[in-house]
């Protein structure tokens, strides 16, 4: 029992990693997604979305259902940072370029929630020559702040999640 009248944002987590069978088994064939949509219709869920990880066919399929009006999404959580914008597959073969993911959502006016803006902390600790270029331009800014600003400056970004255990 949550003991609240409504949920502001409900997220289906980890969508896309296990293929079509998993998405259908976890959310569709068992009626869970239909139930969540009913709860949204009743006002008990204000915003329904999913976090995307993995197979772009699943992402495109869920957006096609949105386009058809069957399952509409209020937001989608995606991995977006200045490396993954155009070079996601260089990091991991299953990753999809954030430019594509964000662009498809923006075309549909679906806000994005951003995960991994620092790419697991690696963008806060860049190579010295890159850090020097950034510091030369704006010495007052931290290296991590460049990554956060990149992630947050796109107009359809709802929120940028830090995922950091320490402020440093």
Language-model segments: residues:
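Active-site gating/metal-coordination segments in enzymes
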Residues: 1-17
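Beta/alpha (TIM)-barrel catalytic core signal, keyed to glycine-rich beta->alpha loops juxtaposed to Asp/Glu
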Residues: 12-168
């Amino acid at each position: 029992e949550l003991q609240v009248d409504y949920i502001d944002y409900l997220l289906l987590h980890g969508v896309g990693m296990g293929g079509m069978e998993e998405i259908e088994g976890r959310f569709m064939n068992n009626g869970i997604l239909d139930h969540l949509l009913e709860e949204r219709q009743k006002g008990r869920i204000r915003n329904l979305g999913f976090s995307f990880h993995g197979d772009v066919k699943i992402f495109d399929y869920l957006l096609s259902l949105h386009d058809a009006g069957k399952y509409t999404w209020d937001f989608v959580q995606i991995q977006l940072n200045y490396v993954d914008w155009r070079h996601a597959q260089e990091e991991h073969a299953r990753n999809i370029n954030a430019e594509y993911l964000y662009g498809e959502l923006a075309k549909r006016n679906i806000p994005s929630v951003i995960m991994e803006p620092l790419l697991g902390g690696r963008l806060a600790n860049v190579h010295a020559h890159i850090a020097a270029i950034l510091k030369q331009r704006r010495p007052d800014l931290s290296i991590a702040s460049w990554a956060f600003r990149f992630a947050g400056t796109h107009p359809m970004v709802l929120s940028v999640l830090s995922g950091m255990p320490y402020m440093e």
